[in-house]
């Protein structure tokens, strides 16, 4: 079993839900990411999603787009993100780390370092899962096999518009968990309709046997608690970025820890 599967199995045995915070690697300061990841774990995070900065992030709203632009301006690319994971792993060998991003940085990395280099280097760095927003499941079987060979799960997005056929395609290649995008649109947009999420999850589970995490639109502990009643995991990204984007270096980790502790407490209530 993968580190992600182990984590979900342990949580399930205790009747708990996974808290999955997201942050853009290298934001808001290029050197802060490993410390921020450790703070997230201290606050109760079960899995960490680390965004790989990209210049054209079509699924991201303005908050995460701006974070990615800042990280890119600071020189953060895929190689630097892998180094951040390596540094995190010096002190933490148990918390799963998922890279979330787009195909272009992965393809450029492989052009530079050779075919299969991304899966190899990500595995060596200590990455547990990869979510590539613009890789369709029907074209991912070889990529999924490459990742599996290095102990890495391939995670996919599902949306309110996903058909049963798309869910079946995802189910064939997905492992770890799937990420249900609870709103139409981009990250950080709109108000979350928890009843609509609750209605959709049984349809997803007819086809998908891995845990289902829900994200997009979760901004506070109360919403996280409501989603946690029906989903296996709660993913929070844009709200964290907003909380830390204008903060001085010395306050970033503490603000994140305080926010996530409140969410963790609500999830466990």
Swiss-Prot record:
GO molecular function, one term: tryptophan synthase activity
Protein name as annotated: Tryptophan synthase alpha chain
Catalyzed reactions per annotation: (1S,2R)-1-C-(indol-3-yl)glycerol 3-phosphate + L-serine = D-glyceraldehyde 3-phosphate + L-tryptophan + H2O
Pathway(s) of this molecule: Amino-acid biosynthesis; L-tryptophan biosynthesis; L-tryptophan from chorismate: step 5/5
Active-site residues, as the UniProt record annotates them: 49 (proton acceptor), 60 (proton acceptor)
Family of the protein in this entry: Belongs to the TrpA family.
Top-rank taxon: Bacteria
InterPro entries: Aldolase_TIM, RibuloseP-bd_barrel, Trp_synthase_alpha_AS, Trp_synthase_suA
Keywords: Amino-acid biosynthesis, Aromatic amino acid biosynthesis, Lyase, Tryptophan biosynthesis
Organism of derivation: Acidovorax sp. (strain JS42)
EC annotation from Swiss-Prot or TrEMBL: 4.2.1.20
Assembly and binders: Tetramer of two alpha and two beta chains.
Described function: The alpha subunit is responsible for the aldol cleavage of indoleglycerol phosphate to indole and glyceraldehyde 3-phosphate.
GO CC, any one term: cytosol
CDD domains the record matches: Tryptophan_synthase_alpha
PANTHER family: TRYPTOPHAN SYNTHASE ALPHA CHAIN, CHLOROPLASTIC, TRYPTOPHAN SYNTHASE, ALPHA CHAIN
């Amino acid at each position: 079993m993968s580190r992600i599967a182990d984590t979900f199995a342990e949580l399930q045995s205790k009747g708990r839900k996974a808290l999955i915070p997201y942050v853009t690697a290298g934001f808001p300061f290029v050197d802060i990411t490993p410390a921020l990841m450790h703070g997230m774990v201290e606050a109760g995070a079960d899995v960490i999603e680390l965004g790989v900065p990209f210049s054209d992030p079509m699924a991201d709203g303005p908050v995460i787009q701006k974070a990615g632009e800042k990280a890119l301006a600071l020189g953060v690319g895929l190689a630097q993100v892998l180094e951040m994971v390596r540094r995190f792993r010096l002190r933490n060998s148990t918390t799963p780390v998922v890279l979330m991003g787009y195909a272009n940085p992965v393809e450029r990395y492989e052009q530079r370092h050779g075919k299969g280099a991304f899966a190899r280097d990500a595995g060596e760095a200590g990455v547990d899962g990869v979510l590539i927003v613009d890789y369709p499941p029907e074209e991912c079987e070889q990529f999924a096999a490459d990742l599996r060979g290095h102990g890495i799960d391939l995670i996919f997005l599902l949306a309110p518009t996903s058909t049963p056929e798309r869910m079946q395609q995802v189910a064939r290649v997905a492992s770890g968990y799937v990420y249900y995008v609870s709103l139409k649109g981009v990250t950080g947009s709109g108000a979350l309709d928890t009843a609509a999420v609750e209605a959709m999850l049984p349809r997803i589970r007819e086809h998908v046997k891995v845990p289902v995490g829900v994200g997009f639109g979760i901004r506070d502990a109360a919403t996280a608690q409501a989603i946690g009643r029906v989903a296996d995991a709660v993913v929070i990204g844009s709200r964290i970025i907003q909380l830390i984007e204008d903060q001085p270096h010395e306050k970033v980790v503490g603000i994140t820890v305080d926010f996530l502790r409140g969410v963790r407490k609500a999830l466990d209530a």
